[in-house]
């Protein structure tokens, strides 16, 4: 065996036998290595240079128009403009027949193979017009398809995987709602807990550490919860919140579900602006992508109530896409010069949009049916500075808040415009009535907030000065002008939160953390006025029975947590949670009962009262029994700990006596103790009396 010797002591040290022996890595004689190079060095061999055919960067475009030589240049211009978006085009060949007419396909060579793959991904099945849809393939795919074996072999049967029930949360016999609570445990590390709002104490369903990097969001029907991560986003669901699907979109900042949960829109930054991707939730495939400019494009896509259409606003136009193809409706945009905003009806395929004033032409609010593109109502408006569109949740009414001016002042270059003498109009469209009549309400004070009653015919506004504002409630009825039914004066509120079931409303000041609970059917009496200092959010549960106010660590760093109240403002519980971030009720899907069945249940509700009261008594009895058992168990645990410590204390008595000078201090009487009082000067003050 080889010996390791120091150069400094070679031949001079007699202790050669103390040198350490090197391990021998030689193979024994006749050794056969059973490990192949691919198994041992697979990752390195995958990177070794290989021969190339030189056609990896070539794509074949089929289903192109067959044109005469006179129209070929125009076709080339259109094709080059479209395909150059995927990379630099080196060469293009358009095969022609004997007469010089193109054959309907072309060969296109990109600078790199990755650009060719990107062209196939983005432009395959691209619809040029109603007659031509491109079929784009890599040139190398032809060789792959030529080598398909003639004998067909059936695919291997994959084992069936039972998917978790995504709707188990609505099967609870007592109809308890669920909610999630998020708290930041470390930078870019958020813990999320899922709870069931049982009585008397909530039941913890699941808690996930490092569940998301920033925050979470429920889907509109409560089926999924989405989490945010550096590579993209993921959706979770089922009884134990398993991962359902993931969507790779690095740096996603915001997501939006379609109303029926068929599609997901992700918004993420790019060097030039925002990239928006529309995904199919069930398959996880990308349906279409867009690149916005540097401006904020959050929620730039608006969905119809049935997921059949999605729309976005362009320059002097609205682009409406059909699903699932995501082609433009009728293959063209709707040209609307001067359009400034639009919104879908929450229950019908109707778009409302407004157009600004132009060249002495008044501003206009228009209702348009989709897909017919038929205008059903127009309303001209004069001296308009801005408009806001507010749909009632039931789709019965549309309110257009119009900011109007008495005088317009422009500078010399007309770059800076000032509006003087501002006042406000509310234009109410009665969507369910014949010819859609419009009523108008004028307010001469500053409007701070507006909110429709979700189920009903009332709306509320905050108007006046911010520090001493008024809250007015209006009622809308058929055939008459909207009437003022109640005005609450000198209220320092900033936001209005209606119950999802209507009738009750919370008037909130999210600056001071004050809240007022109002019953709009009982002479607008304020039932409670609780405080939650620094509260920044208000969340009604889907049934309208509970309200939660929260103090998020995004706003402040101390005293974070949430309070839960009844719909009348009675406090149920207070929860202090360090680094609390977010509280979200889980939405519920719409009921499957018909309106007639719901009316029947409401009519016979008194029959069910005894059953509900009995359940409440049993629940309270069970809760009291569980509480007593818990207290008894805690007492037994404490007594066991106490007896253990007393026995340990008795065993140490001899040691205590020895350490205390052989004096048993355990049994000292009070008369054997000397008490000494010491007084000393603490402070001296001199007060002059006049």
From Swiss-Prot:
Entry GO MF terms: RNA binding; translation initiation factor activity; translation initiation factor binding
InterPro entries in alphabetical order: EIF3B, eIF3B_RRM, Nucleotide-bd_a/b_plait_sf, RBD_domain_sf, RRM_dom, TIF_beta_prop-like, WD40/YVTN_repeat-like_dom_sf
Keywords, ordered alphabetically: Coiled coil, Cytoplasm, Initiation factor, Protein biosynthesis, Repeat, RNA-binding, WD repeat
Gene3D superfamilies in the record: 3.30.70.330, YVTN repeat-like/Quinoprotein amine dehydrogenase
Biased composition (Acidic residues): 15-25
Annotated coiled-coil segments of the chain: 614-645
Region (Disordered): 1-36
Biased composition annotated in UniProt, kind: Basic and acidic residues: 1-11
Pfam hit, one: RRM_1
BP GO terms, sorted: follicle cell of egg chamber development; formation of cytoplasmic translation initiation complex; regulation of translational initiation
Domain RRM span(s) in chain numbering: 57-141
Localization, UniProt: Cytoplasm
WD repeat ranges, renumbered to this chain: 207-246, 292-331, 334-369, 442-484, 530-575
A cellular component annotation (GO) from this entry: eukaryotic translation initiation factor 3 complex
Family in the record: Belongs to the eIF-3 subunit B family.
Protein task: RNA-binding component of the eukaryotic translation initiation factor 3 (eIF-3) complex, which is involved in protein synthesis of a specialized repertoire of mRNAs and, together with other initiation factors, stimulates binding of mRNA and methionyl-tRNAi to the 40S ribosome. The eIF-3 complex specifically targets and initiates translation of a subset of mRNAs involved in cell proliferation.
Complex formation: Component of the eukaryotic translation initiation factor 3 (eIF-3) complex. The eIF-3 complex interacts with pix. Interacts with mxt.
HAMAP family named in the record: eIF3b (MF_03001)
Protein name: Eukaryotic translation initiation factor 3 subunit B
Species, as recorded: Drosophila virilis (Fruit fly)
């Amino acid at each position: 065996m080889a010996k390791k010797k120091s150069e400094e002591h070679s031949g001079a040290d007699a202790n050669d036998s103390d040198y350490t022996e090197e391990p021998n890595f030689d193979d024994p004689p006749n050794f056969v290595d059973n490990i192949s190079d691919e198994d041992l060095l697979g990752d390195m061999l995958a990177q070794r240079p290989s021969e190339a055919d030189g056609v990896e960067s070539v794509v074949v475009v089929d289903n192109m128009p067959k044109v005469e030589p006179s129209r070929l240049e125009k076709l080339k211009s259109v094709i080059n403009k479209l395909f150059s978006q995927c990379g630099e085009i080196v060469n293009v060949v358009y095969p022609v027949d004997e007469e010089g007419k193109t054959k309907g396909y072309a060969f296109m060579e990109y600078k790199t193979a990755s650009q060719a793959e990107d062209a196939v991904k983005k432009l395959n099945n691209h619809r040029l017009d109603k007659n031509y849809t491109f079929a784009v393939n890599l040139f190398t795919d032809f060789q792959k398809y030529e080598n398909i074996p003639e004998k067909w072999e059936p695919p291997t049967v994959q084992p069936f995987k039972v998917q978790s029930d995504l709707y188990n949360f609505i099967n609870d016999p007592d109809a308890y709602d669920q909610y999630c609570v998020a708290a930041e445990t470390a930078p870019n590390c958020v813990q999320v807990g899922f709870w069931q709002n049982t009585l008397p104490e909530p039941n913890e369903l699941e808690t996930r550490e490092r569940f998301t990097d920033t925050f979470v969001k429920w889907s509109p029907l409560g089926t999924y919860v989405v989490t945010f991560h550096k590579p993209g986003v993921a959706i979770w669901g089922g009884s134990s919140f398993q991962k359902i699907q993931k969507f790779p979109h690095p740096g996603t900042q915001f997501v939006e579900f379609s109303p029926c949960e068929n599609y997901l829109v992700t918004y993420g930054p790019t060097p030039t602006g925002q990239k928006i991707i529309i995904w199919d939730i069930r398959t996880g495939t990308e349906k279409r992508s867009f690149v916005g400019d540097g401006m904020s494009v959050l929620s730039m896509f608006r969905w119809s109530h049935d997921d059949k259409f999605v729309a976005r606003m362009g320059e002097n136009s609205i682009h409406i896409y059909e699903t699932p193809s995501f082609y433009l409706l009728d293959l063209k945009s709707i040209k609307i010069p001067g359009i400034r905003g639009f919104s879908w009806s929450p229950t019908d395929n109707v778009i409302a949009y407004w157009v600004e004033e132009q060249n002495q032409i008044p501003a206009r609010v228009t209702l348009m049916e989709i897909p017919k593109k038929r205008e059903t109502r127009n309303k001209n408006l004069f001296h308009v500075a801005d408009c806001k569109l507010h749909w009632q949740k039931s789709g019965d009414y549309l309110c257009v808040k119009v900011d109007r001016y008495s005088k317009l002042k422009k500078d010399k270059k007309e770059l800076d415009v000032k509006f003087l003498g501002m006042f406000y109009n509310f234009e109410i469209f009665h969507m369910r009535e014949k010819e859609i009549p419009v009523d108008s309400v004028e307010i001469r004070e500053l409007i701070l907030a507006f909110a429709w009653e979700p189920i009903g015919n009332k709306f509320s506004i905050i108007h006046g000065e911010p520090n001493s504002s008024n809250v007015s409630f209006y009622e809308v009825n058929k055939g008459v002008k909207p009437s003022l039914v109640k005005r609450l004066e000198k209220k320092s509120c900033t936001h209005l939160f209606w119950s999802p079931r209507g009738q009750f409303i919370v008037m909130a000041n999210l600056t001071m953390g004050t809240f007022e609970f109002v019953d709009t059917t009982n002479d607008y009496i304020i039932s409670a006025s609780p405080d939650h200092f620094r509260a920044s959010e208000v969340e009604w549960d889907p049934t309208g029975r509970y309200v939660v106010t929260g103090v998020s660590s995004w706003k402040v760093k101390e005293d974070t947590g949430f309070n839960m109240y009844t719909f009348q403002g009675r406090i149920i519980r207070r929860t202090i949670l360090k680094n609390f971030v977010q509280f979200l009720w889980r939405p519920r899907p719409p009921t499957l009962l018909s309106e007639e069945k719901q009316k029947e249940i409401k009519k016979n509700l008194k029959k069910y009262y005894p059953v509900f009261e009995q359940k409440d008594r049993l629940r309270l009895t069970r809760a009291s029994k569980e509480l007593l058992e818990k207290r008894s168990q805690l007492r037994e645990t404490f007594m066991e700990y106490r007896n253990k410590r007393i026995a340990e204390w008795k065993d140490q008595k001899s040691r205590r006596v020895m350490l205390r000078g052989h004096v048993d201090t355990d049994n000292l009487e009070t008369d054997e103790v000397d008490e000494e009082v010491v007084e000393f000067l603490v402070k001296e003050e001199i007060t002059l009396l006049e």
